[in-house]
Curated annotation (Swiss-Prot):
It is found in: Nucleus. GO terms for molecular function: DNA binding. This is Ligand-dependent nuclear receptor corepressor-like protein. Residues 514-566 form the HTH psq-type domain. Disulfide bonds: none annotated. The keyword Transferase does not apply.
Amino acid sequence: MEKGTDRMAAAAPAPPAAASQCRSPRCTAERRGVRRELDSWRHRLMHCVGFESILEGLYGPRLRRDLSLFEDCEPEELTDWSMDEKCSFCNLHKETVSDRASVIGSSQSTPTEELSSQGQSNTDKIECQAENYLNALFRKKDLPQNCDPNIPLVAQELMKKMIRQFAIEYISKSSKIQENRNGSSFEPSLICKSIQMNQTENSLQEEQDSPLDLTVNRTQEQNTQQGDGVLDLSTKKSARLEEPKYDPLCSENSVSGRLHRHREDYVERSAEFADGLLSKALKDIQSGALDINKAGILYGIPQKTLLLHLEALPAGKPAPFKNKTRDFNDSYSFKDSKETCAVLQKVALWARAQAERTEKSKLSLLETSELKFPTASSYLHQLTLQRMVTQFKEKSENLQYETTNPTVQLKIPQLRISSVSKPQSDTAGLLDVMYHVSKTSSVLEGSALQKLKNILPKQNKIECSGPVTHSSVDSYFLHGDLSPLCLNAKNGTVDGTSENTEDSLDRKDNKQPRKKRGRYRQYDHEIMEEAIAMVMSGKMSVSKAQGIYGVPHSTLEYKVKERSGTLKTPPKKKLRLPDTGLFNMTDSGTGSCKTSSKPV
């Protein structure tokens, strides 16, 4: 039995002494990460729990009592410390005073005794002004001049001396700059004014929560008036407008010379600005829509350039970069209204003559069974006249509002045309009424124009109950319910297909601008042309032109690619059939109407 058990124990696998580590790279990386975390927590634990708490846990609460013994070891007053004669920082104050005295002595031609006394008095003045400056500075910020009691007294004294020394250096250097600029001796009034200016500058910087700036600003200008001595603290952007205040002697020469230089610089840099941007910015400034600052920021043009252009315009100088087509349109639209009325009266007389000629040709139309296109052309002439009236009205409205909003067209419900026509005025009368209405009411003008355009709306086939007589045809023509294109005198019927034929011909020959449906179509075509020209010339990118001109990005990009010939799929050209193939004149003998041939 013992031998059997020994064999079984030998056959059984021995338990592993220690788990072998996996050598895959993933497990190795995880082990390194865990080890790194443990190492980092050793350092984090001191900051999270506190070093004193860790020591207290290790050594007990007795250690903390022992550490508290060293809290009151700092002496309150310094008795054994004195200024070192060889310290460069401590002697800096004396060197500055001596340098100041030598500078004042060299600037004046007085004896040495007077120089020393005057230098000493000036030094005292500078120190007094520095004290006042620091007091005003601390009082403005509501900060105590005494330092934190936790800071050692040696460090407190050093900080106070350093701040005081910086203030003295700052005031002395600012007075040097004023002496060099004015060419005169050291004046206390100028020092006081410079101190006031420095206080205002530092208070502005402190209000912005920025550190105290003690650097010397060498390009600082004296903003005081010479007449009454009132300090001007206004911060204006344009130095050209401020120059006559503080330099009255040479102001005229300097301003004229600077303007001349600006004009020369403008002529040299004129090619950098866009064709339409400058004209548009000037137009917005003159209309009051934008300020000069806002226009300069929006269009990217310097304010000096805009000011020069605004000054050049009333002087009679032609402003460059004006769009020629826009100038032509503006001059054309600003003509006298009497001239426009005379042109419209001539057009109305011409339309009345065309209407009389159309009425005379009605009887000949009934006698001959063929369709004559002069009547259709007169009908299109009438529509053209109404379009001219609306264009004149739109131009006058655009001058007042200067907007590119699409004109609102009223939709008139389509009525079925019965065989009995409604009593209406003749075409010439309607034309004169439309001319007078276009002056008074825009709503009536829109409705009447829509009625004239849609004289025959789309409808089902209508057949007359009896043969068409001369009187019925005259009534159709006079009341404007049917167009001459819709009559077939052979069988005496009015068909819907002929009506569709007339409608398609009207749409092809006299296309009206379709209603703008979405945001992507609400843009001015002139502005779009300017944007396309700027992008194609390389002066702007598509995104910048979109932001400045306010045109759709996709439309602008498509039009630029279309004109440059870089479209991947160029648009297909529409096939136009000749005029002879527009209508197939067929007569089946059963009263069928004309059929329009559809383009392939």
